[in-house]
Swiss-Prot record:
Stored Gene3D superfamilies: Zinc finger, CCCH-type
Keywords: DNA-binding, Metal-binding, Zinc, Zinc-finger
Protein name: Putative zinc finger CCCH domain-containing protein 58
Zinc is among the record's keywords: yes
Lineage: Eukaryota, Viridiplantae, Streptophyta, Embryophyta, Tracheophyta
Length: 252
């Protein structure tokens, strides 16, 4: 009984089997089941892993491999454990635990984006190629024409046009009828005749005024001449009287 009890696994080992055995340290150039790398190296993702090829974790998707106990399911959308009969001393609970461990590894491998499982790598590549081709066939909008910035050392050419605003267009000429033209011509002739008549009357008035002025200046000169003649006559009479008186007087 003691030997049978010792060979029978405990309930803890049945309900909580180990998820995955720890991989053995990889050796350069050695390939085997123990060297399969199924988890990305967190230190490598942060850029501070110094183990290089000897690291037990994968450095990139090319270095990452799927565990042999995992296979692609029938639908190709999830990773499931191989449906093999349980080993000696293990029950069906261990198979379920292995499946859960495989799902956790797949989530750690590709990151948790909200979905339960991530598509396999081959199918993701096909979808990426399809989306890339569809994106390349989509028409691209035309780019806006932009002028290159002008260098400060190069002077910009002056504008050929004047900065002043153009003069406004003159208003259209008004149309006149024949009657309007005749009336304007008659009015111009009347104005011309009035100017001619006023210019002919003005010299005549000037001549009349000049004659009146000459007459007024000539009359005072005649009066003065008569006075001068009278004065001369009186003076000559006085001299004759004095001479007669001197002759008539007796000598002393």
């Amino acid at each position: 009984m003691d030997s049978a009890a010792a060979e029978r696994p405990s309930s803890y080992a049945v309900n909580f089997p180990p998820l995955l055995p720890a991989p053995a340290p990889a050796v350069a150039g050695a390939m085997g089941v123990a060297n399969h790398k199924s988890v990305l190296c967190m230190k490598w993702r942060e850029g501070r892993c110094h183990n290089g090829v000897a690291c037990r974790y994968a450095h990139g998707e090319e270095d990452q491999r799927i565990v042999p106990e995992m296979r692609v399911g029938g639908g190709g959308t999830s990773m499931h454990a191989r449906s093999s009969p349980p080993r000696d001393g293990a029950s069906s609970g261990s198979t379920a635990s292995i499946a859960m461990a495989a799902c956790r590894i797949e989530e750690q491998r590709h990151g948790r984006g909200g979905e339960s499982f991530i598509l396999p790598r081959s199918r993701r590549k096909r979808q990426a190629l399809g989306s890339g081709s569809a994106r390349s066939t989509a028409p691209t909008p035309p780019r806006a024409h932009t002028t290159p910035p002008c260098s400060r050392s190069v002077a910009a050419p002056r504008a050929s046009t004047s900065p002043l605003r153009p003069s406004p267009v003159p208003p259209p000429a008004t149309l006149h009828s024949a009657a309007d033209v005749q009336r304007s011509v008659a009015r111009a002739l009347e104005d011309f005749e009035q100017r001619e008549s006023s210019s002919s009357v003005f010299p005549l008035a000037i001549d009349i005024v000049a004659e009146d002025a000459m007459t007024a200046t000539s009359e005072p000169s005649a009066t003065s001449d008569d006075d001068a003649i009278t004065t001369t006559t009186s003076s000559s009479t006085t001299d004759a009287d004095e001479l007669d008186a001197a002759v008539a007087a007796p000598p002393k």
